[in-house]
Curated annotation (Swiss-Prot):
The chain crosses the membrane at residues 233-255. Residues 1-21 form the signal peptide. GO terms for biological process: sexual reproduction. This is Glioma pathogenesis-related protein 1. Pfam families: CAP. According to PubMed:8973356, it is ubiquitously expressed with high levels in lung and kidney and low levels in heart and liver. Highly expressed in cell lines derived from nervous system tumors arising from glia, low or absent in non-glial-derived nervous system tumor cell lines. Also found in fetal kidney. According to PubMed:7607567 it is expressed only in brain tumor glioblastoma multiforme/astrocytoma and not in other nervous system tumors or normal fetal or adult tissues. It is a single-pass membrane protein. Coiled coil: none annotated.
Amino acid sequence: MRVTLATIAWMVSFVSNYSHTANILPDIENEDFIKDCVRIHNKFRSEVKPTASDMLYMTWDPALAQIAKAWASNCQFSHNTRLKPPHKLHPNFTSLGENIWTGSVPIFSVSSAITNWYDEIQDYDFKTRICKKVCGHYTQVVWADSYKVGCAVQFCPKVSGFDALSNGAHFICNYGPGGNYPTWPYKRGATCSACPNNDKCLDNLCVNRQRDQVKRYYSVVYPGWPIYPRNRYTSLFLIVNSVILILSVIITILVQHKYPNLVLLD
């Protein structure tokens, strides 16, 4: 009986630890998660060097967050191929931007992920627009015309295209309108000096009450993939582990019944 209880305890602990790891990541409705995504983006946008004359204040967009969540749940280390025409995933934006961060769950935070994107500034020359390595994440974060953001983080046992990682956090932000066109990410100049008409200046950013409203959409269509598909790897993992748990208990009971004097040494 001691062997049986030990086996059950180990299996329950294993499955519980997996479930706990998956559940510690915030959902797209989590207020702290939303505030962090918006705050950190705007922090970096307000601090650009050289200073920006036309940098728009960025606010949350639930539809963009749903798009990010739907794509993140596929656990693929690649960009969504439907963000630009002829596809149209968002009711207001024709073209969307996207940044992806993937890493282990313990080191994930909204701040660390967005900071990682922004740190690409070290390889970007604003004057010449020459990038030494990868700079697209940075330029999207500080793209002046992108004024809406929606992010999601997904727990992935495996990430396709990132085979070295197991049990990772897959963090995606989508932006509207998308940036990264062959031009400068913003206009250089005195802060807020080139804001749109009727805008005000707040922390070096152009703000507009109407533009900055958080809108919810109820008729957004995501062709070809559901809004909240359950990750197939997560589902398979949980099913297999449940079966293993049941079989382990049955086998242990049968072995003890057949060999009642069996003793296991610690």
